[in-house]
Amino acid sequence: MKTVSVHASRSYEIRIGRGLLQGAGEQIRAVTDAKKVMLVSDDAVWPLYGGAVRRSLETAGLTVCSFVFPHGESSKCACTYLELLDALCAQQLTRKDAIAALGGGVAGDLAGFAASTYLRGIGFIQIPTTLLAMVDSSVGGKTAIDLSAGKNLAGTFYQPWLVLCDPDCLTTLPEDIFRDGCAEVIKYAVLGNAPFFDDLRAGSAHAQLEHIIETCVTMKRDIVAQDEFDRGQRQLLNLGHTFGHGIEACSGFAVSHGSAVAIGMAMMVRAAAAFGLCTEKTRDTVVDILRQYDLPVDCAFRAEDMLPTVLHDKKAAGDTINLIVPTAVGQCRIVKTPASEIMDWLRAGGAR
């Protein structure tokens, strides 16, 4: 087992190792004095892992209840959030108890938001089962639900007590969901780790899972340590997301998050090359690795349709938006951009 320690407003460990799921009960018992744990999962993940995790928690002496919701981004909404709060009340969880998210990013965001707001905060554990959640959304303390105006517009910063990453979970992932995670992995390499980028070009993600997870969470740990509340350098982690959220919204969330981030990265590096902020070689190298991992790189939507969602981006401040722009492989910068120029960036990136 590998351990990455995070020191933020709450210090905790990210543990990475095969078979961790079966020992989740003892791992959780060691970091919390909770008597009761609410497992939060979706109806795709629960049949695969819910029983094993429940048994592990019960064997460790914990009382377990569960909340299972329909899988998909559409469940990351106020309605499901309120249903979860009602379930916590019905099961009489107290401040001494805990919520454990079992699943991908939607489960983690939803459970984390509930944990941070129910009784003004109870224990929270992340047990991610997708590559995307392991390398990104389960680490760093961001929780959120979506609003009609866009993604992640209501949320909190709330660090978990513990994160358990079991690469064995990834063996059951459909290939398209695995590819989604690869988009976030490539994001880390592009924004700040050229040697890691070379590793990804040289081999497949399946062959180096532990290395990939440890590298990504360590990078995120280091960035979060400098800027826990997303006011400065942490915004670099949103590479590909500003335009990606516009793509998700325009597709009615038919385009997955990872695919949208991949297209968003490709758009941003194309625009950067068009505006002289990176070389054409950098542009082509980034687009090529996305293609190597069978990720989409072309935008099918009109700039006019994407614009409203992009302008609602969390990195907007007044009449400007901070764009995360690649300047070389392994280097990005934050470019403060007038809202009036965002349409030009979308078109330069390839929006119709």
PLM regions: where:
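A glycine/threonine-rich phosphate-anchoring loop and its flanking beta-alpha core
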Residues: 113-202
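ATP/NTP phosphate-donor binding region
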Residues: 1-98
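C-terminal charged capping/lid subdomain of soluble metabolic enzymes
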Residues: 183-186, 277-352
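Residue-level signal for inorganic ion chemistry
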Residues: 17, 39, 77, 128, ...
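Active-site segments that bind and position negatively charged phosphate/pyrophosphate groups
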Residues: 198-305
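Short glycine/serine/threonine-rich phosphate/pyrophosphate-binding segments
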Residues: 106-113, 134, 246
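Generic secondary-structure signature for well-ordered alpha-helical cores
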Residues: 90, 159-163, 168-175, 183-195, ...
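Solvent-exposed alpha-helices and their adjacent loops that cap or buttress functional pockets
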Residues: 31, 92-94, 117-119, 146-147, ...
